[in-house]
């Protein structure tokens, strides 16, 4: 598949190359299952360079592609899809199925040189080497006005959580400038992915905080490191 590398947290277009080699006795296939721990959206499929209309069915752990007719010949199949990755070496595994035989009968595609036009033979995508667990922390605004008028009443925050192969502790908290914790927005275990939260301007007791500057702190606890990222946010009326 290509490309073999991607940037974390950014939607990337990939192409998966399958070289099918079928004998005269083969019953062929009319379905392709593309499995991954990452979500994906199939945008096109070609057989020997010719576009083929397929039906994409979302299944647990991947997407099943239903071909319009049985494939009983050797060919180069190219699957275009879009995915956003948060884990290094995310795998994409392809399986060939014959609908007449049921889903229990499947042939996994082996990694290898499907076409000389693509240098990569891998079925996993690498992310750039780095030590960050938290990436692309963004606030909906530098300040907000939680006065109940329905305009700018909530502060939104989003960030990428990277390299969490298993659920790990994630804490998102609000402090005043004196270091006193006012509100916990998240104290749970999370997996790698895009995280979105909101603060309504209230403290833990449900009281509206006074106008001023506050510190928003995100802390991710990994196996080998703990990373903390902070942002200042203003509350005004």
Summary of predicted features, one role per range:
Residues 30, 34-49, 81-85, 94-100:
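A eukaryote-biased signal for long
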Residues 37-75:
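A surface/secretory-pathway sequence property marking extracellular, secreted
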Residues 73-75, 123-237:
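Short loop/turn motifs at secondary-structure boundaries
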Residues 18-24, 34-38, 83-85, 160-165, ...:
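Extracellular acidic, Ser/Thr/Pro-rich low-complexity tracts
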Residues 1-26, 126-148:
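Compositionally biased low-complexity segments at domain edges in trafficked proteins
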Residues 1, 93-130:
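Extracellular/luminal low-complexity Ser/Thr/Pro-rich, glycosylation-prone repeat/linker regions
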Residues 9-46, 170:
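Low-complexity, serine/threonine/proline/glycine-rich extracellular segments that form mucin-like
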Residues 64-97:
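Low-complexity, intrinsically disordered segments enriched in Ser/Thr together with acidic residues
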